[in-house]
Amino acid sequence: MKQFDIVITGGAMAGMTLALAVSKLSGGSLSIAVVEPYQADYDAHPGFDSRAIALSLGTVNILKQYDLWQGMAEFATPIKHIHVSDRGHTGMTDIDHQEIPVDALGYVVELTDVGRYYSEQLSQHKNIHLLCPARVSQIERLQHQVCVTLNDGQSLASKLLVAADGARSTCCEQLEVESELHDFEQVAVIANVKTAQAHQGRAFERFTSSGPLALLPMSEQRMSLVWCLKPDQATQIMSLDDSEFKQALQAAFGWRLGEFQTIGHRSSYPLQQSFRQQNTSHRLAIIGNAAQTLHPIAGQGFNLGIRDIATLAESIMSHVQDPGDYSVLSQYQRRRELDRSMTLSLTSSLVHIFSNDYLSFRVARNLGLAAMDNATMLKAPLLTRTLGLVAR
């Protein structure tokens, strides 16, 4: 049986960030295993259709602490300006990086680039062992350690098990850590697109009666589209050919960026919120989407998860001789409670307010957007959380 200080299940962005963060903070003194089921081929870049994620300013500040941002900045697209509007109504608000002032409000990175970069970083951390492709098939918790059996027959023992294996976490299911589910009755249609006008680092969020439509700036003048629709509308939209889809998208978004010229591969997924009230258990910590999965309306999902990672890494440093000790896990749970609760509430409220076409909601949200555009003090609380500059 191979012995480690920490075993992390899930080697995507959350799990790998935690491994690199703990390695950096501990000076490589803790042995870490990362178990990942899917073998990534970083040489087979998806090109135009590469999936992207937005990193808040707070997330960038955290990544800097682990010496991970400098390399990532080379392929990141800065968000200089955010425009928020309500389709068919006058309410709108703008946020510009010069108002803060900061270099950028956030950055957009492509997941393939991050994966390749993290793979390069991994080679510099000899204490991190990537077990891939492999998946957890059995977990046994003892008083002082956790024993994990993999599907290839390998046995691992560690002082701490970290579940970073997504919303449908196999670890959490095996250990019966329950999740609260809420169906937003919306489907996200995602694609990369190109417009006639250059995005110039601008991000857009447009609220419609069926749900929000967001465009994030990417490299090579592409934009990442997330279009939230009612299920029947999403089915119809997905059935359109590219020309028809362009027309529908143009009608929903408008002409602020000119004509939509190129539409990449489209995919869709149902939007559900999952939340595990209990983000720790005996010798178990839960991070990222395994702890909570949010609606993409405010781009808070990964940015909330990175704050899980930073807090857990700091908590581990308080008791490096036993990363799974009760004092570590109770500190992590206590410090994350308020931020998780507030971000979850904010995201859910935004969905219900801005995905609703009742007259009272339309009037309220348009007055709210207009007020925020004219009163910085009203914009500040939402801006602070959007930028990820919140206490952990």
What are the residue ranges of the model-derived segments?
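N-terminal Rossmann-fold NAD(P) dinucleotide-binding loop
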Residues: 15
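Glycine-rich FAD pyrophosphate-binding loop
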Residues: 23-48
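N-terminal FAD cofactor-binding segment of flavoenzymes
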Residues: 46-87
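Conserved FAD-binding catalytic core of PHBH/FMO-like flavoproteins
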Residues: 63, 160-259, 263-266
